[in-house]
Each structure stands twice: as C-alpha cells, then as structure tokens.
Design a protein with these regions (language model features):
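N-terminal localization/anchoring segments of enzymes in phospholipid and broader phosphate metabolism
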Residues: 1-265, 270, 274, 298, ...
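A short, conserved beta-strand element enriched in hydrophobic/aromatic residues
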Residues: 199, 282-283
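A short glycine-/small-residue-rich loop at the edge of a beta-strand within enzyme catalytic domains
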Residues: 259, 283, 287, 314-321, ...
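Short glycine/threonine-rich loop-to-helix capping motif typified by GTGT followed
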Residues: 294, 320-324
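Active-site donor-binding acidic/aromatic loop of nucleotide-activated sugar
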Residues: 337-341
C-alpha cells in the first residue's frame, strides 16, 4: 500500500521542489561554524550535521528569550503582534476558537486594517474539536489569509499519518516564536483538563528568524499548486540591521517525513553521545527507538547525569501506559525518569553540559521523530 500511495510520492516531489528554491536563499554562515568549532567543538559537529543535512545554517546576532510557561510566551507574542508593520505568519498544529485565540485574532484584524499581510496555517487533525469547518471562511472574511494542512477525509489516505506538528510565529521577518505550545486555552492554563499544563517556548529577534520564515513558507506553499514558483519569496527573506545583545549561537531547523533524514532524532542522539556531565530532557511522550534507548543508557553508564521529565497526568492514557513501559529499561541502566506531578508536561526541551540546548516541537516519541513535520532550535553558548 505504501508503494502505491501516489499522494505521498507527489508530496515528496513538491516539498523537494519548494525546498530547492527556498533553502538556497539562506546564508551558509560558515564563519559562525568556524567560531563554534574553535570554542565548543562537540557542539560544532552537531551544527555542521544540521546544516549539511537540512540546509539550515547556524546564526549569531540573535537574541533569545526563554519562556518557562506558555502564557508568558503568549503575552509577549501579543505585544509583538500589535507592533507588526509588514507581515505576520503563524503556523500551528492546533488552534482553538476560544479565549486565547480571540486575543490574537483581535490584534490580527487590527493589523490587517493598516495593511499588514496576515497568514494563518493549521493542521486539520490537530484542530479537530477546537474549531468549526467554517474557520477558514471566517478568517478570510476579515482579511486574514488562512490555509489548512492535509484536511481530514475519511478513507484510505496514508499521508494522513503525516501531520504538521510545527509551531511558528514570524513577525516582519525580524521577530519569531516557537516552542511546545499551540494556540488553545489549555496550553495557557485558561482551562485545566489535565491539571496544570507545563509548556515552554522561545522568542528570537535577529538573523535566525530568516530560517523560521523559510520553514513557514515551505508548508504554506506546499499545499497550493500555484505557489511552487512564488516570485515573492525574496520579499520575506532578507537581512536587516540588528545588533544583538547576546553572543550565543542559534540554529532553527525543520524536520520532515518527506525525506530520508530524521534530523530531530539525530540531533538528540548526537547531543546525548556528546554529553560529558549531564543530559536533561522534557517530553510529553516517551516512545523511542532502540538507537535512542541505547544512547541514553550508554550515557548513563559513562557517568553522565541523564534525566527525563514526563507528565504526571496524561492527556492520552493509552500513550501514557506506553510511555511508562519504557521506564524500567532506562532506569535499570542509570537513567533517571521523573513525572511532573502537578499535571501535563507538554514541553519539548533538552539541555547538555551548560553549552547546548534545544527547544521546539520535537517529542521523544516515534511519531514526532519519524511521521510528523516538526521544527526545533539548536542553541549553543
């Protein structure tokens, strides 16, 4: 059946075509790689892997703000959205037509009235139960351009297994947001279906936002036949004068089931293998391959402090039971697993040896690592 799935083959060709036009627009920033290799070689090797295999470069000249709660990210996001002058791009796995989204929509409508271009992109399956089928029409009626990824149609469609799990906001090509949270009330603890909700995110300002822009445009253009040769790519991807206060390096990257490279998993495994002192993760689901299990256990056997935080209250009991089934095999080799008892930990993060970290959408979960469209940020300091 997989071999006969012409829809998936067609999509692979389409993504390859769009990437061949978009990704070369990013600078290769070889001087940044050279500086990292001189100062933190183990991090430089991972940055080189990402750049060679996903074509997303490493940047400096970018300030990063970390949010330890999703609502803090939302509040900052609302402030930045209200300042938009040219364009706003938003891509999320789930949007709920409720309080949190209404705060965003109010600002988007105001910006549209002063000439700001606004594009919204969401995953249909991820938003089922959150919005009605007329959501796109409602957005278009107020001047907000809206597209849906892979609309759900009952029947045999193997491509339905590939969902858009990315979470990105880009404002004027200068400010960007990503992390674990979607645009639904539960993520901001406006509602509490699973106790307290724990999520994290980051705000970028500076050169690295270009990569988030490319990631958004890839998905936006992939779902419309007429946009593969969009002549307007250049007006959204540009360098502007910005002087960052921070001196670290950041590398936004994307992972896709439309190629044969599992960038998200390889970055995690590489970080684990490079760890010398500690390697810590937060993930809502823990359903991992033998390769990752081996890497985690081997690191613990080397004396690395390996810790994984998972939820104390699950959103899906069946998946929770599978997650817990991995505990014994890890713990017996020295990996420490903690459950976040106040509620559901949805954050997707890692930090290694005080010099490397990731934040984004990629879970320690087979679906996330192999089947979904994902994005992350690799950070070095």
């Amino acid at each position: 059946l997989i071999g006969l799935n012409g829809g998936t083959h067609k999509m692979r060709e389409r993504y390859a075509e769009i990437d061949s036009k978009l990704l070369p627009m990013l600078s290769d920033n070889q001087e940044c790689l050279s500086r990292i290799n001189e100062t933190i070689p183990k991090a430089g090797n991972i940055a080189s892997y990402i750049q060679r295999n996903s074509q997303y470069p490493i940047y400096q000249n970018t300030d990063v703000m970390y949010f330890d709660e999703a609502v803090k990210g939302l509040e900052t996001q609302l402030e930045d959205l209200a300042k938009a002058q040219k364009f706003i791009f938003m891509e999320y796995h789930a949007i709920e037509d409720a309080e949190a989204w209404h705060k965003i929509q109010k600002i988007l409508e105001e910006r549209v009235k002063v000439g700001v271009e606004v594009r919204i992109f969401y995953d249909d399956m991820g938003s089922i139960g959150f919005i009605n089928t007329d959501f796109v029409k409602k957005m278009e009626c107020v001047g907000i351009h809206c597209r849906v990824f892979n609309p759900f149609v009952p029947g045999l469609n193997l491509f339905l297994n590939n969902r858009d799990h990315r979470k990105i906001t880009v404002i004027d090509g200068k400010v960007g947001f990503t992390g674990g949270y979607n645009l639904a009330n539960e993520y901001f603890n406006y509602t509490h279906p699973y106790g307290q909700w724990k999520d994290t995110g980051i705000r970028l300002e500076g050169d690295a936002v270009q990569s988030l822009t490319v990631t958004f445009l890839e998905m936006w253009n992939a779902v419309s036949d007429k946009d593969a040769n969009d002549p307007d790519f250049g007006k959204y991807i540009f360098h502007y004068d910005y002087k960052a206060q921070q001196t670290g390096f950041i590398q936004p990257y994307a992972d896709s089931p439309m190629d044969n490279e599992q960038v998200g998993e390889e970055v995690y495994i590489s970080m684990i293998n490079k760890a010398e002192k500690y390697c810590w993760f937060m993930t809502p689901y823990l359903i991992i391959t033998d390769e990752m299990t081996h890497a985690l256990c081997l690191a613990a056997k080397r004396g690395v402090d390996v810790r994984i935080i998972t939820p104390g209250i699950p959103d899906k009991k069946f998946i929770y039971n599978i997650t817990r089934s991995f505990y014994h095999g890890l713990v017996k080799h020295g990996v420490r697993v903690y459950e976040w008892t106040p509620g559901f930990c949805h954050a997707k993060m890692s930090v290694v040896d005080d010099c490397m970290a990731t934040c984004g959408t990629i879970n320690l979960d087979y679906r996330s690592l192999y089947h979904h469209f994902e994005n992350g940020c690799f950070m070095i300091d």
